Amino acid sequence: MELNNETLRMAVKLWLENEKEAIKQYGHISNWNTSNVTDMSKLFHNAKKINNDISNWNTSNVTNMSSMFCNTYTFNQDIGKWNTSNVTGISYMFYNAYNFNQDISNWNTSNVTDMSFMFYYTHAFNQDIGKWNTSNVTDMRSMFYYACKFNQDIGNWNTSNVTNISYMFCNAHVFNQDIGNWLTNNVTDMSHMFHNAYEFNQDIGKWNTSNVTDMSSMFYNAYNFNQDISNWLTNNVTNMYCMFYHACEFNQDIGNWLTNNVTSMSCMFCNACEFNQDISNWNTSNVTNMSRMFYKAHNFDQDISNLKINKIINTHEIISGTRLHIRLDGESCFNKSIMKKLFSYDRRKDFLKFLVESGYIPYQGSCLKDSYHKIFSKEDIYKIIMSFI
């Protein structure tokens, strides 16, 4: 019996509900004739216990396999010989297919355009897919999200048409392969790309980032990353929020980056313990949020007096925990001249707000924040302001 798109779904539904009845009507699932099927998207969606041999299915006319095995927690069958030459969409295909780990290295992916979320939470998967043809793929976001064991060479992939690689290796804890030759000239979103990619430390300094607008959390918790990315073009980037958050080893010269369009640098170097580079030439004229930018970046003590903060509305704890941290007793190594340049005389109220919100006016080891006016008199506050301006 030849099945089409509609009858195949009916057959699968019956198989999951009553296997014996499905065999009576359609035969065993392993022998179904799927030669006329073009759409297998979501075919086994949420079939948590499905794990039958379907290796002989004819998929030569299938164009869509998106979400096919989504949430099939136990599925782990050999489907490596499937004909995928006409498939264009395989996004979410193995989403939450925790146990899937089969050889699909020979799949023809030349017509695939969307690989987003393909191995999302596919914990067991670690197969060689380095020879896949990805020349037509435009979306790879979250492709290996939480693919905890994946660490294969995919350095030769053609990524020339890819526009989105956000979250691609997020939580891919062991991934550490050379992808430095990837063509990224069309990529616009790199946010969270290596978020929690603990082992990744490869040279990606030659990437073309001229069209990227979002680099937020790109190296968040990328503990080992410390590569030269000084030549990246960042003139179109608007979001650098948490970019190097807890990137413990990172300490590279990025002082020549063009940051004129960036609006958020909040938590950018938060907990980046080793970072201590000169960024005094950065153009921060459009930045509105620098809260916790250098929070607990313990080694940072660079002169940032040239940074423009005229549009900044949030400086909460911008350098708290660094060598620049202010103490009321004056025993820190903070350079007062930096603050004098940052805040003009007519902005002394803003300066006080900056001190308080940033935690720079401690009282017996505690940040004053909203309670500062209850501890200091108006005269004391005035003295504090004038001592730095």
PLM feature spans:
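Negatively charged
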Residues: M1-I389
